[in-house]
UniProtKB/Swiss-Prot annotation:
It comes from Rattus norvegicus (Rat). InterPro entries: ARPC1, WD40/YVTN_repeat-like_dom_sf, WD40_repeat_dom_sf, WD40_rpt. It is found in: Cytoplasm, Cytoskeleton; Nucleus. Belongs to the WD repeat ARPC1 family. One of its GO terms (biological process) is Arp2/3 complex-mediated actin nucleation. Its main location: cytoplasm. This is Actin-related protein 2/3 complex subunit 1A.
Length: 370
C-alpha cells in the first residue's frame, strides 16, 4: 500500500490519466490540480481554473485524453491539451442547480452529468455547431442525482439519487450512437427510457455510489442506511441487499465479476462477494490496523493534554486506518473491473492511497479475490 498526502484540505474527487502517471484532483475548491509522478514523488504540473463554484466531479477520458469537470456553478467544461496547455470548452448543461457528478461513456463520444435539478444531462458534441449540447433525462427522478455509471454497451446509464432510488436509464443518442443490441436489462432503448428501478418504498437512504460490473449484467450500489446492494439482470433482475454494521459507504466499484470494493465514513475500504447463487456477503476490511504502542507520558504531555483536551490520559487521536478521515472515492488503478490488481482511494484527509490486492492477500488471512 502506498499512501501519499497531497493536501491538508479534503480531496473532493479525482481522476487518473490512461497510464496512471498523472492524477487530476480537486482540493475542495473551484480548481483542478494535475499532479505528475516523478519517481516516488508527485509534483504539481497544471492548475485548471475556469469554474467559479466548488468542483464536484472530474473524469479523464483515457483514449482521447480529455478531462471533463463539473461544479456547483452549474457548469461543465471539457478540457483538451494543446501545446502543453489545457484549454476549456463550455458545455451547455441547461440546469438551474449545482452539477454533482460527471462520467465519460466507454466510447468517449458523450458524458453524463448528474445535478441537483433532479435530472441527468447527457452531453454530446454537435460538430456542425462546434459545441457540446445536452439532452435531459428527467422522469421519474425526484431528487438530487449523486452518482452515475455507464454500462459497457455505451447506452445504458445507472444513476443513484437522494430519493433513495437506484435506476437504470437508456441514454441512447441517435446522433452519435449505433442502434444498441438487446441486453439482459431490456431490448427497447429510446432515450430516457427507464429500464429498471430499485429501492425506495419507505426504506433505504441516499444512494451515494453505483457501479456496473465488467459484463454489464450486474449493478452494485451503496446507500446512506449502510446497505450494499447488487442487482443481477441475468437472474431476472434479482436484488440482493446486505445491511452492514458499518458507517455509510460513499463509493463502490466492481473489482471482478463477483467482487465489490466499497469505502466511506469508516475510513477503510471493504470487500464484498456476490456469488453465482445471488448471495451477497461481507468478506473483509482491507486495511491492516497499525499496532498502537503503550508508553509513559511526560509531565509536559500531561499538561498539554489537560489544556487541549481537558484530560490527563494519553488518548491517541490518530485512527488505526491509513486514511484519517472518510473516503470519498474508489477508482480502479491497475487493469479493469474484470480483473482489478490495484485500486485507489482518496478522502477528506487529503490523502491518496493505492491498494495492491496481491499484498492484501498475503497480509490478511484467508483473503481471496474471486
Amino acid at each position: 500500500m502506498s499512501l501519499h498526502q497531497f493536501l491538508l484540505e479534503p480531496i473532493t474527487c479525482h481522476a487518473w490519466n490512461r497510464d496512471r502517471t498523472q492524477i487530476a484532483l480537486s482540493p475542495n475548491n473551484h480548481e483542478v490540480h494535475i499532479y505528475k509522478k516523478n519517481g516516488s514523488q508527485w509534483t504539481k504540473a497544471h492548475e485548471l481554473k475556469e469554474h467559479n463554484g466548488h468542483i464536484t466531479g472530474i473524469d479523464w477520458a483515457p483514449k482521447s485524453d480529455r478531462i471533463v469537470t463539473c461544479g456547483a456553478d452549474r457548469n461543465a467544461y471539457v478540457w483538451s491539451q494543446k501545446d502543453g496547455i489545457w484549454k476549456p470548452t463550455l458545455v451547455i448543461l441547461r440546469i438551474n442547480r449545482a452539477a454533482t457528478f460527471v462520467k465519460w461513456s466507454p466510447l468517449e463520444n458523450k458524458f453524463a452529468v448528474g445535478s441537483g435539478a433532479r435530472l441527468i444531462s447527457v452531453c454530446y458534441f454537435e460538430s456542425e455547431n462546434d459545441w457540446w449540447v445536452s439532452k435531459h433525462i428527467k422522469k421519474p427522478i425526484r431528487s438530487t442525482v449523486l452518482s452515475l455509471d455507464w454500462h459497457p454497451n455505451n447506452v445504458l446509464l445507472a444513476a443513484g439519487s437522494c430519493d433513495f432510488k437506484c435506476r437504470v436509464f437508456s441514454a441512447y443518442i441517435k446522433e452519435v450512437d449505433e442502434k444498441p443490441a438487446s441486453t439482459p436489462w431490456g431490448s427497447k432503448m429510446p432515450f430516457g427510457q427507464l429500464m429498471s428501478e430499485f429501492g425506495g418504498s419507505g426504506t433505504g437512504g441516499w444512494v451515494h455510489g453505483v457501479s456496473f460490473s465488467a459484463s454489464g449484467s450486474r449493478l452494485a450500489w451503496v446507500s446512506h442506511d449502510s446497505t450494499v446492494s447488487v442487482a443481477d439482470a441475468s437472474k431476472s433482475v434479482q436484488v440482493s441487499t446486505l445491511r452492514t454494521e458499518f458507517l455509510p459507504l460513499l463509493s463502490v466499484s466492481f473489482v471482478s465479476e463477483n467482487s465489490v470494493v466499497a469505502a466511506g465514513h469508516d475510513c477503510c475500504p471493504m470487500l464484498f462477494n456476490y456469488d453465482d447463487r445471488g448471495c451477497l456477503t461481507f468478506v473483509s476490511k482491507l486495511d491492516v490496523p497499525k499496532q498502537s504502542i503503550q508508553r509513559n507520558m511526560s509531565a509536559m504531555e500531561r499538561f498539554r493534554n489537560m489544556d487541549k483536551r481537558a484530560t490527563t490520559e494519553d488518548r491517541n487521536t490518530a485512527l488505526e486506518t491509513l486514511h484519517q478521515n472518510s473516503i470519498t472515492q474508489v477508482s480502479i488503478y491497475e487493469v479493469d473491473k474484470q480483473d482489478c490488481r490495484k485500486f485507489c482511494t482518496t478522502g477528506i484527509d487529503g490523502a491518496m492511497t493505492i491498494w495492491d490486492f496481491k499484498t492484501l492477500e498475503s497480509s490478511i488471512q484467508g483473503l481471496r479475490i474471486m
